[in-house]
């Protein structure tokens, strides 16, 4: 079974031209033809305005004026040019009312803070003296 697969692979390579039938171990002559058919490289600096030899044009020729260009067919809706923004004075912002209806919350819902002494206080000793252990 393996020999039939190998034989089929060999026939496929021969038909595709991957193996030359004349037994010549040198590479095929198709590589040299490609190099000979390519245009010669320019001999010197490029001339401004002349296209690079062998380079295809980047863009097609523009269509003649007056031809149908769908991107230029804008509807006559009067939307162009756009209207400038209105010059009305800005309106004051509406007050944020989290309680639109019902009973209103008290003015200050927080309890009063405890009274504090604003006199100078001694800071606590963060590093108390240690007793010596013997």
From Swiss-Prot:
Subcellular location: Secreted
Major localisation: secreted
Acidic residues composition-biased segments: 122-134
Pfam families assigned to the protein according to its UniProt record, in alphabetical order: SPR1
GO CC, any one term: extracellular region
Spans annotated as Disordered: 18-134
Pro residues bias spans: 39-67, 81-98
Annotated signal sequence range: 1-21
Classification via InterPro entries: SPR1
Keywords: Secreted, Signal
Name of the protein in question: Psoriasis susceptibility 1 candidate gene 2 protein homolog
Protein source organism: Mus musculus
């Amino acid at each position: 079974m393996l020999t039939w697969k190998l034989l089929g692979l060999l026939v496929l390579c021969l038909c595709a031209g991957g193996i030359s039938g004349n037994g010549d171990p040198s590479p095929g002559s198709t590589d040299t033809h490609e190099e000979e058919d390519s245009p010669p490289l320019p001999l010197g600096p490029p001339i401004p305005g002349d296209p690079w030899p062998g380079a295809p044009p980047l863009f097609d020729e523009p269509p003649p004026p007056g031809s149908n260009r769908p991107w230029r067919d804008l509807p006559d809706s009067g939307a162009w040019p756009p209207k400038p923004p209105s010059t009305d004075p800005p309106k004051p912002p509406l007050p944020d009312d989290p309680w639109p209806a019902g009973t209103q919350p008290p003015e200050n819902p927080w309890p009063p803070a405890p009274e504090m002494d604003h006199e100078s206080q001694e800071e606590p000793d963060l590093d108390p003296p240690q007793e010596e252990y013997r």
